[in-house]
Amino acid sequence: MEVSPEQHRWVTHHTVGQHPETHHPGLGHSYMDPSQYQLAEDVDVLFNIDGQSNHPYYGNPVRAVQRYPPPPHSSQMCRPSLLHGSLPWLDGGKSIGPHHSTSPWNLGPFPKTSLHHSSPGPLSVYPPASSSSLSAGHSSPHLFTFPPTPPKDVSPDPAISTSGSGSSVRQEDKECIKYQVSLAESMKLDSAHSRSMASIGAGASSAHHPIATYPSYVPDYGPGLFPPSSLIGGSSSSYGSKTRPKTRSSSEGRECVNCGATSTPLWRRDGTGHYLCNACGLYHKMNGQNRPLIKPKRRLSAARRAGTSCANCQTTTTTLWRRNANGDPVCNACGLYYKLHNINRPLTMKKEGIQTRNRKMSSKSKKSKKSHDSMEDFSKSLMEKNSSFSPAALSRHMTSFPPFSHSGHMLTTPTPMHPSSSLPFASHHPSSMVTAMG
C-alpha cells in the first residue's frame, strides 16, 4: 500500500526526528517503534470502549501507525472521558462507514468497532437522524461541534461525506457554521451576540465537553412572557379609564321633598319612595321623622346671662361660668383659683377687664397642617408632571430597558433554561445555568 504525502508528513513527527535510533532499518520513515507510543494512559482513555469486546487488528504497519492519535501538544486533541459503552442513544443499526482517508482525524475514538478496514457493521455514537452532520463531525478538524439533536430534514450530501480532500474539509466547516447560525437565529438572539457566543462555545466545547449535556428541547420564550405595549398603555381600548361618578349628583332634575335641595352627594328615598337628600334621608332614618328645616335659636352665652353674678367677686362678665363647692355660680377666674388652691380667690386680684391671651397652636394641629400642605404640594407637582407619568410614557420607559440574563449581562431576549446546541457551554463559565442547576 502506498503512503500519501499527508501520511508521510503526519508520521514523520518531530518526536520521530529527534530519536533517529527508533527508526526501523527495514521499513523506512513511515514506521516507528511501538515503545514510543503513548500506550499507558492516552490509548486507554481514547479506546476505552474498544477494550471491552472488540480488539483492533491492523493489516499493515502503516495503518497501525495511522490509528494512533497525534501528540499531546496538538490544539485539536480531545479526550472524551464522559462517554461510556452503556449510553442509551447508541444506534447499532446505523454505521458511519469505513472512512479510511489520509487525514489523521478519520477515526473517532468513540465507535465501538473493530479497527480493521473491512470490519462490517460498526456502532455509531452519533444520533442517527442526520448523516451529513455525522460525516461532518467525523472528519472535520472541529471534531465535536456537531449538535446533539440535528434537524431531520437535512439530507445527506455526498460532497460532504467524501473524505481525503482539503476542499471537503472547508465545505464541512462552512456547513457547521451555517447550521450553528441557523439555530442561533431560530432562538431569536441578536446576530452579533449569536456569532460571538457560537465561536466561544465551539472552541470551548472542543476543549472541554465533546457533547452538550442538555438537548435543545426547551422552546424559546414566546411573546407571552412580556405583555405587548398595548396592554401597558399603548391603546386606550385595552385599559379604558372608567368614568368616575360625579361627586354631587344633579341629574334628572331631582329635588329633596323635605328641604328642596337639588345637589347632594347621595340621593336617598323615604318610606313613600320620594327622593331625599343625604342629610334629610339620614335624619329620617335615625330619628324616624323629617329633618326640621328651621334651626332652633341658640341660647344666650353664659357670659350674657341676665342676673348672674359671681358669688366671690360679684362680677357679671366672664367667659365661662363655674360653680363652687356649695353650688353657687362663680366666674371663670374665681372657679379656677379655687380649683387649684382650694381657697377662694382674693378680691385684690380682681380686674375690670377680662384678660385674654393669644393661644398658641398645639403640636397636633401643627402636624396636621404641615401634612395637609405637603399633600397639596405633592398633588400640584403630580399635576404638573402628569404627562411624564402617563401609561404611554411608562410603556416607552419599560420597553427601553432590556431584560437581564442569569449572567448579569443585558440581552435583547430572555435566555432559555437549557443552553442550545448552537451555544455550547464550557466549564470556564461560572454563571452558566447548567452549573447553577446542578
Swiss-Prot record:
Q: Positions of the region Disordered? A: 1-27, 100-173, 232-255, 350-378, 405-438
Q: Can you cite an annotated GO cellular component?
A: nucleus
ZnF locations on chain (GATA-type) = 256-280, 310-334
Q: Where is the major localization of this protein?
A: nucleus
Ranges of compositional bias, category Polar residues: 160-169, 410-438
Residues annotated as transmembrane: none
Reading the lineage from the top rank, the first entry is Eukaryota
Carries keyword Nucleus? yes
What Pfam families has UniProt attached to this entry? Answer: GATA
Where is composition skewed (Basic residues) in this entry?
357-370
A single BP term in Gene Ontology: ectodermal placode formation
InterPro entries named in the record = TF_GATA-2/3, Transcription_factor_GATA, Znf_GATA, Znf_NHR/GATA
Query: What does the UniProt keyword field contain?
Result: Activator, DNA-binding, Metal-binding, Nucleus, Repeat, Transcription, Transcription regulation, Zinc, Zinc-finger
Q: Where is the composition biased (Low complexity)?
A: 122-142, 232-241
Q: Which GO terms describe its molecular function?
A: DNA-binding transcription factor activity, RNA polymerase II-specific; RNA polymerase II cis-regulatory region sequence-specific DNA binding; zinc ion binding
Where it sits in the cell: the answer is: Nucleus
The protein depicted here goes by the name Transcription factor GATA-3
- Look up and give the organism this protein is from: Danio rerio
